[in-house]
Swiss-Prot record:
Has multiple subunits with at least A(3), B(3), C, D, E, F, H, I and proteolipid K(x). Its EC number is 7.1.2.2. Component of the A-type ATP synthase that produces ATP from ADP in the presence of a proton gradient across the membrane. The A chain is the catalytic subunit. It comes from Pyrobaculum islandicum (strain DSM 4184 / JCM 9189 / GEO3). GO terms for biological process: proton motive force-driven plasma membrane ATP synthesis. The keyword Metal-binding does not apply. The gene is atpA. InterPro entries: ATP-synt_VA_C (IPR055190), ATP-synth_a_Xtn (IPR031686), ATP_synth_asu-like_sf (IPR023366), ATPase_F1/V1/A1_a/bsu_N (IPR004100), ATPase_F1/V1/A1_a/bsu_N_sf (IPR036121), ATPase_F1/V1/A1_a/bsu_nucl-bd (IPR000194), ATPase_F1/V1_b/a_C (IPR024034), P-loop_NTPase (IPR027417). This is A-type ATP synthase subunit A. One of its GO terms (cellular component) is plasma membrane. Belongs to the ATPase alpha/beta chains family. SUPFAM superfamilies: C-terminal domain of alpha and beta subunits of F1 ATP synthase, N-terminal domain of alpha and beta subunits of F1 ATP synthase, P-loop containing nucleoside triphosphate hydrolases. CDD domains: ATP-synt_V_A-type_alpha_C, ATP-synt_V_A-type_alpha_N, V_A-ATPase_A.
Length: 593
């Protein structure tokens, strides 16, 4: 079960390791660095090492574990901050006695779960009942916000059987909480189990994503929505607001579980993001957001190879909570750094490079990652539904969306929210470019909006979007000939587009009145602008100039409404405002006649 190092090249080690398997977890060198086999040629194994390889020497031992890199899944996972291979950073700091991670800290020193922690276990099944892989055996209260459901793991060794023994009471995470009698004998079930990070967890059936994931961000929810179980990418250059977008989603998205994966970001940016996340409160309960969050951190000064592990680790933890029936949101920041890690390892082991040096299997890996999202019918005897939504930022060099990571990501996602440096530098946040963005979920979530908010939601949304497209066309004329060359109708289009940009799309992430924006507030803000557009067309037909309409008191107030009216009074206040707006425009028309 062991071999010897032959050569070392950065994060890649070649070893003589008979019997090694692809993606097997190994310990490299005298200090037992974490590594994963990424290529096998006969008895030779190429290993990507998840820790700094400085000081390793040819001839040092490489020890096989016989199992793949796996996530430890069970109570005490919530509220933890892990590195890319699921070692708790707090434990590592205590062992290292330094702000930097010591090498060779194994799971025996820093276990991912606190196996000695005690919980009150409440069974969901009784002795004599039949259980199947994926069934919920019971539950424990892990935090004030989250009830942790203990599953009969959907692993090959766990087969259907009958509950022989199960009882409520106080148990440690590592204690046996049930015994299941099967054809293969009696299986003892503990509160936790391991799952290989590269293997998607099974489900019975994938469902269409029909319910929108409300994020509180108007540009996303109304213009370019994402559904529960959907996928989205947020590409943008440095300084365009990717991290603030991720922070806003983590705080206000209506998912029960949030899993931010900080993958390859700069150390100071990751520290800022962590400090921000630790201070955040759950908007519904006022409890710390960390009580429903698990964070994976893998900064750019940590070893390159561990970036790949961190993305898979976060997704596996997300799937585990999805299997408990929760709506889960995984936020990866950023997949470009993950792809760069893949490129470095692929070049070191001598694989043929493709476009810009990335490996030829880059599209396959991206597809495998995004395809783990979905709204699914879960394993087990009872019909339960859970969802895993994935939103990932992409950092294209120089904001070039034609580079391989962004262009390949576009093939596998349902919503595309590109961030524009032009909008960011003009202080328009979120800086999502409405001319480039798209969502494939508009048709599927339309039913939910029509049923729960208003039947004319789609018509108003499409009208506002078409006005923004017309504005872009008219801006070309204005740049060359000025506004004097435009008709009154075209001037009105520009005025309405300004209202859409300033009064609807723009949103202050740090203003509690403006963010989050409830679905009814979003709809009525949109309807107010639509009323200005429709009534304005009638006024222009009656001979009233667009400049006169823009100076009306209610119209002047339109861009400020988002910051004046709170979610709890939005329905009454905005409905009243729309009536006043229509009345003022109609009074202006009657005076002219």
């Amino acid at each position: 079960m062991s071999g010897k190092i032959e050569y070392i090249s950065g994060p890649v080690v070649k070893a003589d390791l008979p019997g090694a398997r692809l993606y097997e977890l190994v310990f490299v060198g005298e200090i037992k660095l974490f590594g994963e086999v990424v290529r096998v040629q006969g008895d030779k194994a190429f290993i990507q090492v998840y820790e700094d390889t400085t000081g390793l020497k040819p001839g040092e031992p490489v020890v096989r574990t016989g199992e793949p890199l796996s996530a430890w899944l069970g109570p005490t996972i919530m509220g933890k901050i892990y590195d890319g291979v699921q070692r708790p950073l707090k434990n590592i700091e205590e062992i290292s006695k330094s702000p930097f991670i010591a090498r060779g800290v194994g799971y025996d020193q820093a276990p991912p779960l606190d196996l000695k922690a005690e919980f009150d276990f409440k069974p969901n099944v009784k002795p004599g009942e039949e259980v199947y892989p994926g069934d919920v055996l019971g539950s424990v209260k892990e935090t004030e916000l989250i009830t942790h459901y203990i599953l009969y793991p959907p692993l090959p060794e766990y087969v259907p059987g009958t509950v022989e023994w199960i009882a409520d009471g106080k148990y440690k995470v590592d204690d046996v909480i049930a015994r299941i009698k099967t054809k293969r004998g009696v299986i003892e079930v503990k509160m936790w189990h391991k799952w290989p990070v590269r293997r998607p967890r099974p489900f019975r059936e994938k469902l269409p994503p029909v319910e929108p994931l409300i994020t509180g961000v108007r540009t996303i929810d109304t213009m370019f929505p994402i559904a529960k179980g959907g996928t989205a990418a947020i590409p943008g250059p440095f300084g365009s607001g990717k991290t603030v977008a991720i922070r806003t989603l983590s705080m206000y998205a209506q998912s029960r579980i949030i899993i931010p994966v900080l993958c390859g970001e700069r150390g100071n940016e990751a520290a800022d993001a962590l400090q921000g996340l630790l201070k955040l409160k759950d908007p519904n309960t006022g409890r710390p957001l960390l009580e429903r969050t698990t964070i994976i951190v893998n900064t750019s000064n940590m070893p390159v190879a561990a970036r790949e592990a961190s993305v898979y680790m976060g997704t596996t933890i997300g799937e585990y909570f999805r299997d408990q029936g929760y709506d889960v949101l995984v936020l990866a920041d950023s997949t470009s750094r993950w792809a760069e890690a893949m490129r470095e390892v692929a070049l070191r082991i001598g694989e043929m490079p493709s476009e810009e040096g990335y490996p030829a299997y880059l599209p396959t890996r991206l597809a495998e990652f995004y395809e783990r999202a979905g709204r699914v019918v879960l394993m087990g005897s009872k019909e339960r539904i859970g969802s895993l939504t994935i939103a990932a930022s992409v950092s294209p060099p120089g904001g070039d969306f034609t580079e391989p990571v962004t262009s390949n990501t576009l093939r596998f996602i349902g919503a595309f929210w590109p961030l524009s440096p032009r909008l960011a530098y003009s202080r328009h946040y979120p800086a999502i470019d409405w001319l480039l963005a798209f969502s494939r979920y508009v048709d599927t979530v339309e039913v939910w909006w029509s049923k729960n908010i208003s039947p004319d939601w789609r018509k108003i949304r499409d009208t506002l979007q078409s006005i923004l497209v017309k504005e872009a066309e008219l801006q070309e004329i204005v740049r060359i000939l000025g506004t004097e060359a435009l008709s009154e109708y075209e001037k009105h289009i520009l005025n309405v587009a300004y209202m859409i940009r300033e009064g609807f799309l723009k949103q202050d992430a740090y203003n509690p009145v403006d963010t989050p924006s409830s679905p009814i507030k979003q709809y009525l803000l949109m309807k107010a602008i639509y009323a200005y557009y429709e009534e304005g067309l009638k006024a222009i037909e009656a001979g009233i100039p667009a400049s006169v309409l823009r100076e009306l008191e209610t119209v002047k107030r339109l861009p400020r409404l988002r910051m004046e009216i709170t979610n709890d009074v939005a329905k009454e206040e905005l409905t009243k405002f729309i009536e006043m707006l229509i009345s003022e425009i109609r009074t202006t028309i009657s005076k002219r006649q």
